[in-house]
Structures are given as structure tokens and as C-alpha cells.
Amino acid sequence: ANAVGIAVGNAPYSPASVADYAIMMMLMVLRHIKPMLLRYAGQDYTAGYLGRELPNLTVGIVGLGRIGETVARHLQGFGCRILGWNRTPRADLSDLVEAVELDELLSRSDIVSLHLTACPETEHFIDVAAIEKMKDGAVLINTARGPLVNNSALIDALESGKLSGAGLDVFDGDRL
């Protein structure tokens, strides 16, 4: 494939482990787990961190390869709406996700979960323009590759309240 200019990628680890990790990050951000744990460490047990529940939300999965598909399959048990976008449409997943165009996914999703490879076409895939299309208060999850997200745009969106949270397993080369 490389000889004829076709890029080939493979993630040698279990799609299920990454999918579970992505969903765990969604739940942690939605339920404010880190601030809650910090309060508990200081022996502050007052209420105030109820958060949001997945059954009331729409999750948009960007990239429906093995990992993105597995995220969608695992999310089915949570009762949320699942939207999906893939560079190459996946008609075989029509029973699992509602296939939509990227702009629609960004505008309708309460959570956007990235599952793309890193290549020149996906560098800073989530930038100022993409974030502007996202729902106010949305959450961004990136367990794929750091360069998919423009760090400066993400920080600005979090500080302004445009995004309510982010779960990041990977970062672009710059420190956050």
C-alpha cells in the first residue's frame, strides 16, 4: 500500500480498552469527578457536583474505525443518542450510529469524542472554527492523537465557557 501512496495505520492495542477509557473520561468530565475528589481530600463533603447524565445527551464520534466503532457499541448501554462521522462513510454501522456530516455532528453533540489517526489532513482538526460550530457547553474527548486538537483554541474555549470540559489522554507538542 505504501508503494502506491496509500497510508496504512494500525493501533496494536485493544480497541475495547481505549473505548472504555474514552467513556470513562466522558463520565468523569460530566460528573465533575476531579473537582469532587479534590474537595473530598480536603474533607469537604458538601453537595454541588451532580453533573449531567449520558442518557440525556448526544455523543458525536469522529472517526469510526475499530476504536470509534467500539466506543459506539459500548455507549449503547448508556441510552444516549450516538452520531457518527467518518471520512469514508460506514453504511454497515447504520444500526449503531446516526451518520451525519461533520458540521452537524459538531453542532448537535453534547460530547465530541475523537478517534482519528494523525496525518497532515487531521492536524488541528479541532481548531477555532470547529469549536465555534460546537454546542455551547459541549465536552471534547481526545484519546486518539494530540495533534488533532489546537491547544490554544481548546484553552480559549474552556476559559470562555464555550466548552464545559475536556478529557484529554494526549496533547499536541505544546504543554497545556
Predicted regions, residues:
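Conserved beta-strand positions in the Rossmann-like core of class I SAM-dependent methyltransferases
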Residues: 9, 83, 147
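Glycine-rich Rossmann-fold phosphate-binding loop(s) that bind the pyrophosphate
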Residues: 64-65
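Structural/interface elements that position substrates and couple domains in central-metabolism enzymes
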Residues: 17, 81-83, 91
